[in-house]
UniProtKB/Swiss-Prot annotation:
<dbReference type="InterPro" id="IPR036638">
    <property type="entry name" value="HLH_DNA-bd_sf"/>
</dbReference>
<keyword id="KW-0804">Transcription</keyword>
<dbReference type="GO" id="GO:0070888">
    <property type="term" value="F:E-box binding"/>
</dbReference>
<dbReference type="InterPro" id="IPR045895">
    <property type="entry name" value="bHLH91-like"/>
</dbReference>
<dbReference type="GO" id="GO:0006355">
    <property type="term" value="P:regulation of DNA-templated transcription"/>
</dbReference>
<protein>
    <recommendedName>
        <fullName>Transcription factor bHLH89</fullName>
    </recommendedName>
</protein>
<dbReference type="GO" id="GO:0052543">
    <property type="term" value="P:callose deposition in cell wall"/>
</dbReference>
<comment type="subunit">
    <text>Homodimer.</text>
</comment>
<dbReference type="Pfam" id="PF00010">
    <property type="entry name" value="HLH"/>
</dbReference>
<keyword id="KW-0238">DNA-binding</keyword>
<keyword id="KW-0539">Nucleus</keyword>
<keyword id="KW-0805">Transcription regulation</keyword>
<dbReference type="GO" id="GO:0003700">
    <property type="term" value="F:DNA-binding transcription factor activity"/>
</dbReference>
<dbReference type="GO" id="GO:0005634">
    <property type="term" value="C:nucleus"/>
</dbReference>
<dbReference type="InterPro" id="IPR045896">
    <property type="entry name" value="MYC1-like_bHLH"/>
</dbReference>
<feature type="compositionally biased region" description="Basic residues">
    <location>
        <begin position="207"/>
        <end position="216"/>
    </location>
</feature>
<dbReference type="InterPro" id="IPR011598">
    <property type="entry name" value="bHLH_dom"/>
</dbReference>
Length: 420
């Protein structure tokens, strides 16, 4: 192989250097022989001709002749004349070796691989034109492991399992292989995958990112409407006789019913205390005693009302789709007012209810207003009776509703008695 070819293939030759400097550096007797740099090693060593001869005569590895050939070309350029003469004699002995003829066919390929493995010492302009393949392998934190991999085989440094798949480069957002919120930690050449979420500290802030697992569930407008509708339905079922289905009417009737219940409770308390007072009178105890102390506010209020001759007063009203009942109690007098459609003879049935409640019926009046009949009953509470307004109204409504449904089923209506 010619000298010109050697100058072009060896990477350490500088074509821009002048000829005078090349000749002076090549034939200067005071300059020591050049040092050989081993790829992937941190130290350089000087080689002698004996080591070089032993290096060429080893037939075990096919890559050794290629290394020796490259070393010979480099010494031919930079060595002194004395070293050149000794080197030619050693090369003559090597060519006479029988094993050299068998291995010479592999020298050219090995030499080309060795040149490709050599470091590039060209100028920065040539480095800028070099395009390296994009590797998907992660970088190694330990430099010793990286040197071993680079010097072991050329296929390790040049082969990339994912390069032929032409995967796009990942954005520099701290993600690895497209997996979000994961980090890669290298510990003595071992890649450890761990979840970033487990290492985050709770700083008291509600994060609404993609990694948040807890999500607040807010009810929709449709669910709220269904919820309110169910609640109004339950409230309507608590009212004894609702008249309308709209929400405003349901709320109004519920308020009236609550007030009615409060009045009924007060009435019950007064009736109970009144019975106790009468029982004491029968046993001969003085009800009105200056030294008597009331055990409760109800008893005290009952005694005050009796001293002042206060009157018992209660009022209650019930409504349904076909009947309205109004009951008022003043002391021991009861007034019952009924308004109903012309379907049944309500006068007879209401009179039976008054008799069952132990009320003394004193007066009955009636009138016809359009398609409705109106009746007014005046009665008096018998002595010892504990009747109250809610009991009277509920009983009257129950009887009238039953008779009205029977009249509708039989399709037989009766006109109530009306007086002038």
């Amino acid at each position: 192989m010619g000298g010109g070819g050697m100058f072009e293939e060896i990477g350490c030759f500088d074509p821009n250097a002048p000829a005078e400097m090349t000749a002076e550096s090549s034939f200067s007797p005071s300059e020591p022989p050049p040092t050989i740099t081993v790829i992937g090693s941190n130290s350089n060593s000087n080689c002698s001709l004996e080591d070089l001869s032993a290096f060429h005569l080893s037939p075990q590895d096919s890559s050794l002749p290629a290394s020796a050939s490259a070393y010979a070309h480099q010494l031919h350029i930079n060595a002194t004349p004395n070293c050149d003469h000794q080197f030619q004699s050693s090369m003559h002995q090597t060519l006479q070796d029988p094993s050299y003829a068998q291995q010479s066919n592999h020298w050219d390929n090995g030499y080309q691989d060795f040149v490709n493995l050599g470091p590039n010492h060209t100028t920065p302009d040539l480095l800028s034109l070099l395009q390296l393949p994009r590797s998907s392998l992660p970088p190694f934190a330990n430099p010793s492991i990286q040197d071993i991999i680079m010097t072991t085989s050329s296929s390790v440094a040049a082969y990339d399992p994912l390069f032929h798949l032409n995967f796009p480069l990942q954005p520099p957002n701290g993600s690895f292989m497209g997996v979000d919120q994961d980090q890669t930690e290298t510990n003595q050449g071992v890649n450890l995958m761990y979840d970033e979420e487990n290492n985050n500290l709770d700083d008291g802030l509600n994060r609404k990112g993609r990694g948040s697992k807890k999500r607040k569930i807010f009810p929709t407008e449709r669910e709220r409407r269904v919820h309110f509708k169910d609640r109004f339905g339950d409230l309507k079922n608590l009212i004894p006789n609702p008249t309308k289905n709209d929400r405003a009417s349901i709320v109004g009737e519920a308020i009236d019913y609550i007030k009615e219940l409060l009045r009924t409770i007060d009435e019950f308390k007064l009736l109970v205390e009144k019975k106790r007072v009468k029982q004491r009178n029968r046993e001969g105890d003085d009800v009105v005693d200056e030294n008597f102390k009331a055990q409760s506010e109800v008893v005290e209020q009952c005694l005050i009302n009796k001293k002042n001759n206060a009157l018992r007063c209660s009022w209650l009203k019930r409504k349904s789709k076909f009947t309205d009942v109004d009951v008022r109690i003043i002391d021991d007098e009861v007034t019952i007012k009924i308004v109903q459609k012309k379907k049944i003879n309500c006068l007879l049935f209401v009179s039976k209810v008054v008799d069952q409640l132990e009320l003394d019926l004193h007066h009955v009046a009636g009138a016809q207003i359009g398609e409705h009949h109106s009746f007014l009953f005046n009665a008096k509470i018998s002595e010892g009776s504990s009747v109250y307004a809610s009991a009277i109204a509920d009983r009257v409504m129950e009887v009238l509703k039953k008779q009205y449904m029977e009249a509708l089923s039989a399709n037989n209506g009766y006109h109530c008695y009306s007086s002038d």
